[in-house]
Amino acid sequence: MSEKQVVGILGGGQLGRMMVEAAHRLNIKCIILDAANSPAKQIDGGREHIDASFTDPDAIVELSKKCTLLTTEIEHINTDALAAVTKSVAVEPSPATLRCIQDKYLQKQHLQVFKIALPEFCDAPDQESVEKAGQEFGYPFVLKSKTLAYDGRGNYVVHQPSEIPTAIKALGDRPLYVEKFVPFSMEIAVMVVRSLDGKVYAYPTTETIQKDNVCHLVYAPARLPFSIQQRAQTLAMDAVRTFEGAGIYGVEMFVLQDGETILLNEIAPRPHNSGHYTIEACPTSQFEAHLRAICGLPFSEINTQLSTSTTHALMVNILGTDDPDYVSKIAKRSLSIPGATLHLYGKAESRKGRKMGHVTIISDSPQECERRYQMLLDVKDPVESPVVGIIMGSDSDLSKMKDAAVILDEFKVPYELTIVSAHRTPDRMVTYARTAASRGLRVIIAGAGGAAHLPGMVAAMTPLPVIGVPVKGSTLDGVDSLHSIVQMPRGVPVATVAINNSQNAGILACRILATFQPSLLAAMESFMDNMKEIVLEKADKLEKVGWKNYSA
């Protein structure tokens, strides 16, 4: 298919390694410019690789003569040398784009021109300008290096004026700028593919968890309302459209504490740590997507979707620690975990904080991903995140609602149970309903008596299915509760069970979950078979002893 295409890759680290893996399947020849025995070269037996620094101008010229196309696995390269060879070989993304993005301040200025939502920032050529920025933005603020900044390196959070000299010294002689500190609730990322003709395609929004300023975990999709995920994808695509050049771009963003505002943090013009999950979770990995984009091969929105509507992924970085055996322990343990795929990068020396590999866990629910992740950590008593919420208006309802919990325990479905009053704690009810989906809940069981507004009000504020349990009160035998819950207006459904029958609510919740959890579907079939057997046993007994001698 691509026998004539020869791709030169500047950089032979783990990103280059995984790019080469994808290239092999597409029959694309790769020539790598980096040190001898770099991770990418270990898995490509070609003899034309160049053993030199990927910033060496002469080596870049030599590479260009052997290839039809140059690309990079890292943005910290010699853009002047790349620009000089563009007359004889294609470079993707363009040297101009790489030059703009590798300088974080230029990147922010560029995006600001196109009205991309960003934190406030300003230049900081000297200590006086940093002090002025502190007065303008307030404390804390973030002092950042314009260049050679990644994985938290090149950033310093300044909490008070006296820390400014220390911060400047810590960041060395590199040019600096100041960014206003934004109180965020979550860090997210979207991988965006840009084709040669400028079309852009977004992978799902992911949630990234940092540890010691290095990406530690990636949840795909992010644990956010779908509307927020879509807005993040739109912002990421809008940002990538402003640049020239094909390839994959990693767009990092913040979700602020209001849960609505999204600001762009920074862009990487290459495969990104937050996109590793795509190897197992999507039809086309970020590495293959990059190659398809720069080589002009077919690509569409289907390539960037999760493989199924129930696919969930959790990517765990394996970082070196003080324990020399840590990496091998995690690697070996991962091989016994269902749905887990191990990627080791071929790095000989394990240093603290060094990326040695990653594990991607795939399952049909985020809770199952979490459970398997705890297996990876060898947690003895793993705590599972709830997928069902059981709520009631008062503790007086507990005697009727506990049967739902009994059923969920029987099916081993994790749940949370609490009191949420529609009338006495309306703010708590609103918060509970609006955050339920993003917290990982998939079904809500709401019990209420009398006016019984709780199920309907919750259903009006969450996209999740709500099961209403009419609770028998002191008057009207619970018929008032039943009538209240079933009389919901069009567009706001509540699945209502019989009065006081929270057991059926629990069973219905399990059936809803079973539509995308095969293991739960099998358990439900077994439950139904067991009920049948109980009835058949009773029928057999009645027929044998007769009605006069029958006792239940």
Curated annotation (Swiss-Prot):
ATP binds at residues 134-189. PROSITE patterns: ATP_GRASP. Keywords: ATP-binding, Decarboxylase, Lyase, Nucleotide-binding, Purine biosynthesis. GO terms for molecular function: ATP binding; metal ion binding; phosphoribosylaminoimidazole carboxylase activity. It catalyses: 5-amino-1-(5-phospho-D-ribosyl)imidazole-4-carboxylate + H(+) = 5-amino-1-(5-phospho-beta-D-ribosyl)imidazole + CO2. The keyword ATP-binding applies. One of its GO terms (biological process) is purine nucleobase biosynthetic process. GO terms for cellular component: cytosol. Residues 108-295 form the ATP-grasp domain. Transmembrane segments: none annotated. Pathway: Purine metabolism; IMP biosynthesis via de novo pathway; 5-amino-1-(5-phospho-D-ribosyl)imidazole-4-carboxylate from 5-amino-1-(5-phospho-D-ribosyl)imidazole (carboxylase route): step 1/1. The keyword S-adenosyl-L-methionine does not apply. Its EC number is 4.1.1.21. In the C-terminal section; belongs to the AIR carboxylase family. Class I subfamily. This is Phosphoribosylaminoimidazole carboxylase.
